UniProtKB/Swiss-Prot annotation:
Similarity section: Belongs to the MinE family.
Full protein name: Cell division topological specificity factor
InterPro entries: MinE (IPR005527), MinE_sf (IPR036707)
Job of this protein: Prevents the cell division inhibition by proteins MinC and MinD at internal division sites while permitting inhibition at polar sites. This ensures cell division at the proper site by restricting the formation of a division septum at the midpoint of the long axis of the cell.
The entry's keywords: Cell cycle, Cell division
Any single biological process term in GO: cell division
Disulphide bonds in the chain: none
Organism: Ralstonia pickettii (strain 12J)
Length: 84
């Protein structure tokens, strides 16, 4: 790595920055409209997959819930881990 590239740093391409910003705006618009969070089942499956690498759990041992009140969103994740 040259000193010049170190000082100036690697810049992200404007297209990728614009894409990231658009994704954030779209996600915000979806949640502001009161539409149900369609990512919750996928989040629950991924959590089961990750946690089951370390502890034996089933799909029913994890509950994921999203609550909206005024301008506040609360993502609640309940994980029941069996006694060892």
């Amino acid at each position: 790595m040259s000193i010049l590239s170190f000082l100036l740093g690697e810049k992200k391409k404007t297209a990728s920055v614009a894409k990231e910003r658009l994704q954030i705006i779209l996600a915000h618009e979806r949640t502001a409209s009161g539409a149900p969070a369609d990512y919750l089942p996928a989040l629950q499956r991924e959590l089961v997959a990750v946690i089951s690498k370390y502890v034996k759990i089933g799909n029913d041992d994890i509950k994921v819930n999203l609550e909206r009140q005024d301008n506040l969103e609360v993502l609640e994740v309940k994980i029941e881990i069996p006694q060892a």
